[in-house]
Regions:
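Active-site substrate-recognition segment that forms the wall
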Residues: 1-42, 170-178, 187-262
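Conserved beta-strand termini and adjacent loop/short-helix elements that scaffold enzyme active sites
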Residues: 114-119, 166, 247, 256
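Short beta-strand/turn micro-motifs at beta-sheet edges
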Residues: 121-125, 240-243
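Conserved beta-strand segments of alpha/beta enzyme cores
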Residues: 110-112, 162, 211
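Helical element adjacent to the flavin cofactor pocket in flavoenzyme catalytic cores
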Residues: 95-107, 119, 126-192
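Short beta-strand and adjoining strand-loop segment in the mid-core
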Residues: 86-90, 105, 136-139, 258-261
Length: 262
């Protein structure tokens, strides 16, 4: 579920001042980031959360269908698995979990509530430091994200796509169905364009007059080589804000997020 839940207002201070917390912030970047922070906090309420959840659900539903179509055309052997994902928690934040479960139920998301025994039946190597969980048995996880992207890229080229590597200087929408993109070498015209530059996207969206509250988030992970067989599927510990995923490179542990600009 999206991260603008009402309880985030209470969790953030605790995360920031804990040396083992999942959130880090560069304090000298706060003045520049303050407008984004204020808009984010203003949206940490139930009404905004339900609004975001509704439209994220619509996008994610369509994206999975689109991926399924692509996966039928590429070889994802040893790159992708469909073994589901498990979220676990303790009674400490049970109200937040109950709200998330209800929101997903209302949106028609298929989910199965598990007790400790049922979780251990699925993942016997996990220490039972939790009191319950939720299982989404239809979920995919990537064992090699780079390998999957490479396969999709190769399919794109095979279908007649062109890959041009140039630095974009500016872009503007000349009409409803035409975008002008100027690079360091020439100018291009496209009927449809997608801005997918990660943290650098805002420089381009600003040129289109779109006031998008976008800032930078860095994520960090650690790989434990040779331990990927300890679990069969991703497990997310919601109370601590971290997760583990079995991958080809090893068991990946993720959870630390840094907000600090480019």
């Amino acid at each position: 579920l999206q991260l603008n839940r009402p309880d985030v207002l209470y969790d953030v201070p605790k995360m920031l001042f804990s040396s083992s917390g999942p959130l880090a912030l560069k304090w000298n970047y706060i003045p520049k980031m303050l407008p984004w922070i204020l808009r984010y906090l203003n949206n940490c309420n139930k009404k905004s959360m339900l609004h975001t959840a509704k439209y994220m659900h619509q996008i994610l539903n369509q994206s999975m269908d689109a991926y399924e179509e692509i996966f039928q055309e590429i070889d994802t052997s040893n790159l992708l698995e469909q073994k589901g994902i498990i979220y676990v928690w303790t009674n400490k934040n049970l109200k937040s979990r109950e709200l998330e479960i209800k929101v997903r139920d209302d949106l028609g998301v298929k989910q199965k509530i598990l007790n400790v025994k049922e979780i251990l039946d699925l993942e016997p190597n996990v220490k039972p430091v939790f009191t319950g969980g939720c299982y989404y048995d239809y979920a995919y996880h990537a064992r090699d994200p780079k390998g999957i992207v490479k396969k999709i890229f190769e399919l794109f080229i095979k279908r007649g796509g062109k890959f041009i590597k140039e630095n974009v200087k500016s872009l503007k929408q000349s009409s409803y169905n035409e975008t002008l993109i100027e690079t360091e070498k020439k100018e291009y015209k496209f009927e449809k364009s997608v801005i997918a530059c990660g943290a650098f996207s805002k420089k381009l969206t600003d040129q289109l007059g779109e006031n998008i509250p976008l800032d930078t988030e860095r994520g960090y992970h650690v790989h434990f080589k040779g331990m990927e067989s300890l679990i069969k599927r991703p497990i997310i510990f919601l109370d601590r804000g971290f997760g583990m995923t079995p991958m080809n490179q090893g068991l990946r542990a993720v959870g630390t997020v840094e907000l600090g600009g480019l």
